[in-house]
Amino acid sequence: MSSLRLRLCLLLLLPITISCVTVTLTDLPAFREAPAFRNGRECSKTTWIPSDHEHNPSIIHIAMTLDAIYLRGSVAGVFSVLQHASCPENIVFHFIATHRRSADLRRIISSTFPYLTYHIYHFDPNLVRSKISSSIRRALDQPLNYARIYLADLLPIAVRRVIYFDSDLVVVDDVAKLWRIDLRRHVVGAPEYCHANFTNYFTSRFWSSQGYKSALKDRKPCYFNTGVMVIDLGKWRERRVTVKLETWMRIQKRHRIYELGSLPPFLLVFAGDVEPVEHRWNQHGLGGDNLEGLCRNLHPGPVSLLHWSGKGKPWLRLDSRRPCPLDSLWAPYDLFRYSPLISDS
């Protein structure tokens, strides 16, 4: 539901007076203003200009999507990044949103993070709507879930490297550590989980086709979660990765070769060809599975990023007063104030 502006007038007697006020009906939540985060002494203060074609390695670029349903998670994610960053003023956020809500979302981001350097890019849902087939969970079928495929087209050429974050995670370490990883010859860096059973990701039709399954021949069976990726956008553009991903999406639309939304095309293009990142940078699956969203425990080892991938989202479970134990780790980053039906304008 879009915001709706109404003019309400009240008739007051003795003497007769008509008093009017403009209100806005909205389905977007309100948030507390985040504190200003400043650079440490070791940081060189820089300003990023989108029209500048020179690459500045001291600026960290982070891309996320923005929409009404996951807005609370996105705000918490941004807050967590800034709170733990050594050079927060050198971080530029690139938000991807559909045109329908971009003005409202811009207002919320600006009021919640007055000191944030950010840009909002319009994503046309029609770009992927005809290429999406239904999956095991409705949230995985939303067009904005596929926006990560088009980052190289949406972001300026000057952005040669970007970190992509999902909207259901919080960072509990300095994001500069993730930014500095050496991608070497690879397009994408992400925590990898090898010895995966790929039969679980693709249908029998895929495995019965010599042409389809040959795409994975001689490839290491390595799974990676696409909610946390470091991407070399220059190499992505050179190797026409978007076209390759779209090709698999079109095949899926005709022959249904997988069930899991936007992940399988990434596996078909990148499996076994990803720069491994420490597992601490994506403690994923905290939202449980895609069907029930049951509580999960942390994986063994150190943690730099907590990711509530899966059906269960921490803000929904906290609001329902049925949180999982690990949801308490997300709560300190929640800037949610209230969800008004009517707000003054």
Curated annotation (Swiss-Prot):
Pathway, per UniProt? Answer: Glycan metabolism; pectin biosynthesis
Its EC top class is transferase
List the InterPro entries.
Glyco_trans_8, Glycosyltrans_8_dom-fam, Nucleotide-diphossugar_trans
Reply yes or no: does the keyword Transferase apply: yes
> Which membrane topology term applies here?
Single-pass type II membrane protein
**Which parts of the chain span the membrane according to its record?**
8-28
Query: A GO CC term?
Result: Golgi apparatus
Classification via SUPFAM superfamilies? Nucleotide-diphospho-sugar transferases
Q: Which GO terms describe its biological process?
A: cell wall organization; pectin biosynthetic process
Write down what this protein is called. Probable galacturonosyltransferase-like 3
Q: Which organism is it from?
A: Arabidopsis thaliana (Mouse-ear cress)
